[in-house]
Amino acid sequence: MYNYVNETWQKMWKEKSEGIKEKAIAWRKGPTIVRIERPSRIDKARRLGYKAKQGFVVVRVRVGRGGMRKSRPKAGRRPKHLGTVKIKADVSAREVAERRASEKYPNLKVLNSYFVYKDGKYAWYEVILLDLSHPAIADEFRHLRT
């Protein structure tokens, strides 16, 4: 069944369907980090360890696209050596999304994350978080405790 869900999602993504565009417009207007009731891509979430039970939390995170922005140095130098453009981050947008979600929810642990959608300005990821103190999942994910 999840194979069909995956095929449908791929078809929507390739055809740039109106449904997903409308969702993206709503996501763009909303806050950066949003807790959602259930994953948008259930097939991907299940593959990465999500289960529909208490203690699992799914969060959609919006990350800006493009290169890093670095402030212009105050001291004089030739423009070529300013070091303000063409700077790449050492972390991926997915890692940035996971870090932001874990900062917003400090009592939860990041299990995994996956890509949802991107447009010209933003990329959206859904991050699966775990409440390790919840009795429903405490024994199953005991190895994640620090």
Could you say what each language-model-derived stretch is?
Residues M1-T146:
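Ribosome-associated RNA-binding proteins
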